[in-house]
Amino acid sequence: MSWHPQYRSSKFRHVFGKPASKENCYDSVPITRSVHDNHFCAVNPHFIAVVTECAGGGAFLVIPLHQTGKLDPHYPKVCGHRGNVLDVKWNPFDDFEIASCSEDATIKIWSIPKQLLTRNLTAYRKELVGHARRVGLVEWHPTAANILFSAGYDYKVMIWNLDTKESVITSPMSTISCHQDVILSMSFNTNGSLLATTCKDRKIRVIDPRAGTVLQEASYKGHRASKVLFLGNLKKLMSTGTSRWNNRQVALWDQDNLSVPLMEEDLDGSSGVLFPFYDADTSMLYVVGKGDGNIRYYEVSADKPHLSYLTEYRSYNPQKGIGVMPKRGLDVSSCEIFRFYKLITTKSLIEPISMIVPRRSESYQEDIYPPTAGAQPSLTAQEWLSGMNRDPILVSLRPGSELLRPHPLPAERPIFNSMAPASPRLLNQTEKLAAEDGWRSSSLLEEKMPRWAAEHRLEEKKTWLTNGFDVFECPPPKTENELLQMFYRQQEEIRRLRELLTQREVQAKQLELEIKNLRMGSEQL
């Protein structure tokens, strides 16, 4: 038998990492000097939040995504904690709400204004007080609105319901007290019905978060886990840590049987923590090492060998932390499937790195952009607390598309299109028709206008959007780079208009043929 590995066909074999140019990086950012093994960075389609240094307490910066270049040394901070900020996470269903936790044993919820900050933001929306020691991790529930999890150095995971009027919440909905040491990481499965944790006692636990009971526990001594991650709907866990020989290692587990890992792979002898990231849409796993500049990526499958190494992005600049852009914020026109924001403390720099699938065609690539989780919750807080589970509501990343799997929600939470920008120009009757046209056949607007007119207005609305961006709301370009970006957007818009014109011509020819057939049929009668 040949020693060469069996050839495996994959559409992601040639994925490569593309670092942003210098003018598209964020320079002179005072990144935290904390030694905790957290990401220290959170990203959404509007903002970058990064933990920073602040005298007399903890703070973090919220930088608009488009505000690249050198940061003003007096740029306003979000400050209000009495101790260092240890973790920040954006609300997945509200791009203007963020949670932070600190060494002062509190969690704070902040509402970020849509306009640029002109002075330090000190007024928080809610404060959560319940932990006896500092809080190291916060995590939002992936499908239920206003449910937040926090893990503290008191060895407890607390579940908070933010759907209340109180500004200071002193009692969590429930507390998970099964850990014997400091909790190092938390991860949810796709619908949020299971919680996986790693702990300083070297054990991986799969927990029912509502009951607080441990369903599975791994005490395998050959792998000391530091981070754990659910792998989508594969019913598997990926953990990173060290082997008994102190080599950095990744291990794959069956979530229903944590007695022995399905596979283990040693990576190198470095000492930095490995941060795992999984993209369920492409089944790709990214492993980012703290203290080095490399990003390894793999393809995950349900069948053996489970993990297939693709390649590695290499850089000389070591990262202290890392942020990840949600899928709805990616640039689909350049076939971008993942985007990292790398914190480089040696240069006080945040460097975006885009993972690109090389394609020759400029059209939308359906095969690499399946329906993905959007920015709308599929459950209310009370529904989840009462025992309901539901998968995320899916959206298409095609510019101008609508929800693909809508669920009825209470009247106070109207359904909206998460792919469109928050612009009042688009929140009109035409947008409502576009969002409802595919799945609400009883719409009053549809009754008042013919089907072809509704389709025409829907297509017309789509042409206003370039990669989910309203071309009429663009500010005039100030630099040569912005001018080039505007030029490429206009070229993409021209191409899309040509495609639309071709479709209209085909429809017109079909109508002419139908009319001709009807006339011939009437003459024969």
UniProtKB/Swiss-Prot annotation:
InterPro entries: Coronin (IPR015505), DUF1899 (IPR015048), WD40/YVTN_repeat-like_dom_sf (IPR015943), WD40_repeat_CS (IPR019775), WD40_repeat_dom_sf (IPR036322), WD40_rpt (IPR001680). It comes from the Eukaryota. Pfam families: DUF1899, WD40, WD40_4. Residues 485-524 form a coiled coil. GO terms for biological process: intracellular signal transduction. GO terms for molecular function: actin filament binding. SUPFAM superfamilies: WD40 repeat-like. Keywords: Actin-binding, Coiled coil, Repeat, WD repeat. WD repeats lie at residues 24-71, 72-122, 123-170, 171-214, 215-259, 260-305, 306-342. Binds actin. Component of the N-Cor repressor complex, at least composed of NCOR1, NCOR2, HDAC3, TBL1X, TBL1R, CORO2A and GPS2. This is Coronin-2A.
